[in-house]
Regions:
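Gly-rich Lys/Arg/Thr-decorated short loops/hinges at beta-loop-alpha junctions or inter-strand turns
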Residues: 3-4, 120, 161-169, 200-202
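Well-ordered secondary-structure scaffolds
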Residues: 5, 10, 15-18, 28, ...
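A glycine-rich helix N-cap at a beta->alpha junction
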Residues: 123-149, 219-225, 229
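Glycine/serine-rich anion-binding loops at beta->alpha junctions
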Residues: 77-100, 104-116
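Phosphate/diphosphate-binding glycine-rich loops and adjacent basic-rich segments that engage nucleotide
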Residues: 144-193
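Acidic, glycine/proline-rich low-complexity segments that act as flexible tails and inter-domain linkers
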Residues: 1-88, 127, 260, 308-319
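Alpha-helix C-terminal capping segments
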Residues: 47-48, 94-107, 187-192, 227-228, ...
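Short beta-strand segments
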Residues: 109, 143, 151-154, 199-203, ...
C-alpha cells in the first residue's frame, strides 16, 4: 500500500477503505508519510468530501493514533459535551457541576481560545492555582473520587489530529466538514466518551455561520458517533450575539458562578439548563427531557451545583475562596461604561466583532502560544430585542491599557445596531 495511491483515489472521488485510511493516518503520525503528502490528502478531502463511513473510519484511526482512555472501570457511562465555540460561551463551567451534582460523573478535556472564540481553560485559569494539566492517571482518579474533572487535553490523546490540524491551518483546508467533524469526534472518543452531547453554534460569531452549514456538521458528527458505537446528540444553538452578558476570562467565570448561585443572565441560564438536560438524559439519569431539566434546575436551587464547582476547583488546586467571594477576581485597571447614543430596539450585537475586540484588549490570542489577560473584556447590557433609551448603559469595557480603550469602544459600539421597530429576541436553539 502506498500513500500516493490513496491520495490519487481520493483525488478521483473514490471511496477509501478503512484499511487505507488507517495506513495513511498511522504513517503520517509516525513520520513515514511526509507533510506534503498529508497536505495533498487534506486538499483532496476538502475538494471531494468523504462519505459518513469514510469520516467515521478517519475519526477512529485518529483516535487510535495515541492513547485511548478506557473509563469503564471508573464510571458506569462516560458522558461528554462539546461546544463548537463562540463568544461568551462559558457553558462548560456551569453545566459540568450541574450534571455532576445530579449524580452523573463527568470528565471533560477542554481547549484554549484561538482567534475571536474563547477557551474554557483560559477562563478557569483566572482562578489562581487551578491546574489544567492533569495526567491521564490524575484524570481517572479525580473522576472516580470527586465525580468531576475539567482539564486540558493530554498530549497522548489523538496525536494525529494535532499534526493534521497544524497542516490544515496553513494549507487552506480548515473549512472541510469531514475534517472538522473527525477532528472533534476523535478527541472525544480518545478521551473515553461513550455518550456525547454536541452544541453546534451557528451565526455571526460561529465558525459555521449559516444554519445549513451547522446542520451538515451536526448530522455528520452524529453519524460518526453512531458508526463508532457512541450515543451522540447534536443541538444547534445561536451565536449571532454573545451568550450571556460577559465576554472575557474572569468576567465569564464570575457570570458562570453567579448562574450556579441562581442568578446570571436569563439566556445563559436557559442555555445551560437545556444542555445539562440533554447530558443527563443521554447519561440515563432521567426518563425524559422534562425530568432531566427538573434535575438540572434543582441542582441550582438546592446549591448542590455550586458545591460541586467548589469540589472541582479544590481538587485541581484552585483557590476556592474565589468561588465564595467574586470580588477577589482580578479586575481591570480601567472600567468604562458606554451609553446608548440613541433610543430604540437592539437589532444586532455582532458576536464576532465583540470577540475580536476582546482579543484586541488581550482576552484572547492572535497566535497560538500568546498569553491572555484574565481581567479584560466586556459586559453587554442590552441584547437583541431589548429596548434601550438614549443615555442608558449599553456595555462596559474592562481594559488594562488606556491606549486600547478608544479602539475597543468603537468596535463594540459598531457591533450594536438599532431599530425604531420592535425586534424579536433571537432564539437560543434552532434544533
Amino acid at each position: 500500500m502506498r500513500a500516493v495511491d490513496i491520495i490519487i483515489k481520493k483525488r478521483d472521488k473514490e471511496q477509501l477503505t478503512a484499511e487505507e485510511i488507517e495506513f495513511f493516518v498511522r504513517g503520517f503520525t509516525n513520520g513515514d508519510i511526509p507533510d506534503y503528502q498529508a497536505s495533498a490528502f487534506a486538499m483532496a478531502v476538502m475538494l471531494n468530501g468523504m462519505t459518513p463511513f469514510e469520516t467515521a473510519d478517519l475519526t477512529l484511526a485518529m483516535a487510535r493514533s495515541g492513547q485511548v482512555l478506557d473509563l469503564s472501570e471508573v464510571v458506569d457511562i462516560a458522558v461528554d459535551k462539546h461546544s463548537s465555540g463562540g463568544v461568551g460561551d462559558k457553558t462548560s463551567v456551569s453545566v459540568m457541576p450541574m450534571v455532576a451534582a445530579c449524580g452523573l460523573p463527568v470528565g471533560k478535556m477542554s481547549g484554549r481560545g484561538l482567534g475571536f472564540s474563547g477557551g474554557t481553560l483560559d477562563k478557569l485559569e483566572s482562578i489562581p492555582g487551578y491546574r489544567v494539566d492533569l495526567t491521564t492517571d490524575e484524570f481517572k482518579k479525580q473522576l472516580k473520587e470527586k465525580g468531576i474533572v475539567l482539564t486540558g487535553q493530554s498530549l497522548d490523546l489523538a496525536p494525529a489530529d494535532g499534526k493534521m490540524y497544524a497542516l490544515r491551518d496553513v494549507t487552506g483546508t480548515v473549512p472541510s466538514t469531514p475534517l472538522i467533524a473527525s477532528s472533534i469526534m476523535c478527541k472525544k472518543i480518545a478521551a473515553g466518551a461513550q455518550a456525547i452531547v454536541l452544541d453546534v453554534k451557528t451565526g455571526l460569531g460561529a465558525f459555521m455561520e449559516t444554519l445549513n452549514e451547522a446542520r451538515e456538521l451536526a448530522e455528520l458528527m452524529v453519524d460518526i458517533g453512531r458508526l463508532a458505537g457512541r450515543k451522540t446528540v447534536a443541538l444547534l444553538s445561536d451565536m449571532n450575539q454573545p451568550l450571556g452578558n460577559a465576554v472575557g476570562n474572569a468576567l465569564e467565570v464570575i457570570e458562570a458562578i453567579d448562574m450556579l448561585r441562581g442568578g446570571g443572565p436569563a439566556d445563559f441560564r436557559e442555555h445551560c439548563l437545556h444542555v445539562a438536560a440533554h447530558v443527563l438524559l443521554l447519561g440515563k439519569r432521567a426518563q425524559d427531557l422534562e425530568e432531566a431539566r427538573a434535575l438540572a434546575e434543582k441542582s441550582i436551587t438546592d446549591g448542590s451545583a455550586l458545591e460541586k464547582f467548589r469540589v472541582l476547583v479544590a481538587a485541581q488546586g484552585g483557590d476556592v475562596s474565589y468561588v465564595d467571594d467574586l470580588s477577589k477576581f482580578e479586575r481591570a485597571k480601567y472600567v468604562e461604561v458606554v451609553n446608548a447614543p440613541r433610543g430604540g430596539f437592539i437589532s444586532q450585537v455582532h458576536a464576532r466583532s465583540v470577540g475580536e475586540a476582546a482579543v484586541l484588549l488581550g482576552a484572547g490570542r492572535a497566535r497560538k502560544g500568546d498569553s491572555v489577560d484574565h481581567a479584560v473584556g466586556f459586559v453587554i447590557h442590552k441584547k437583541v430585542g431589548d429596548r434601550v433609551e438614549e443615555g442608558q448603559p449599553l456595555f462596559e469595557i474592562h481594559a488594562n491599557e488606556e491606549a486600547k480603550l478608544a479602539e475597543a469602544r468603537l468596535a463594540v459600539h459598531s457591533a450594536h445596531q438599532f431599530s425604531n421597530e420592535i425586534v424579536l429576541p433571537l432564539p437560543l436553539f434552532y434544533e
